[in-house]
Design a protein with these regions (language model features):
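Residue-level recognition of specific faces of alpha-helices
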Residues: 1, 72-78, 89-90, 102, ...
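Structure-specific DNA junction-binding interface
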Residues: 1-78, 84
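Amphipathic, charged-and-aliphatic alpha-helical interface segments
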Residues: 52, 59-64, 84-103, 124-127
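Glycine- and Gly-Pro-enriched alpha-helical subdomains that act as flexible
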Residues: 112-115, 125
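Charged, well-structured binding/catalytic surfaces in domain cores that contact anionic ligands
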Residues: 121
């Protein structure tokens, strides 16, 4: 398992970043909150904590600035009906602190406003 990747940020888009480390360019999926934090850092050494998702047809890396963001991402994926891309969409719509507050207050309505997330799945996140 890969814990983090540190290297030169060579490319940045709202959905992914490329970090070159030891001559290898790693495409790392990111949330919009991470994108906002990375804007202006292209060409600089950057460190992202990562979670690696390995499936039959793909190996994906998802990057985070803090351990708390990564823990929240992993926790969201334990909910039935939530995959890595849906978890990333949730984390693009709200900050980690906002998501924790939404869950703590039981505000399934706020979660169901995220694209691709219906009311039943939003309720499962709350529970």
């Amino acid at each position: 398992m890969i814990d983090y990747i540190k290297g030169e940020l060579t490319f940045l888009s709202p959905t992914y970043a490329v970090i070159e480390a030891a001559g290898v360019g790693y495409q790392i999926n990111i949330a919009l909150t991470s994108y906002s934090a990375l804007v202006g850092n292209e060409g600089q050494v950057t460190k992202l904590l990562v979670t690696e998702i390995i499936r039959e047809d793909t190996h994906d890396l998802f990057g985070f600035f803090t351990a708390g963001e990564r823990e929240l991402f992993v926790m969201l994926m334990t909910v039935s009906g939530i995959g890595a891309n849906t978890a990333r969409m949730i984390m693009s719509a709200y900050t980690a602190a906002e998501i924790r507050q939404i869950i703590a207050t039981g505000n399934a309505r706020a979660l169901s406003q995220v694209k691709g997330l219906g009311p039943k799945t939003a309720q499962r996140i709350i529970v």
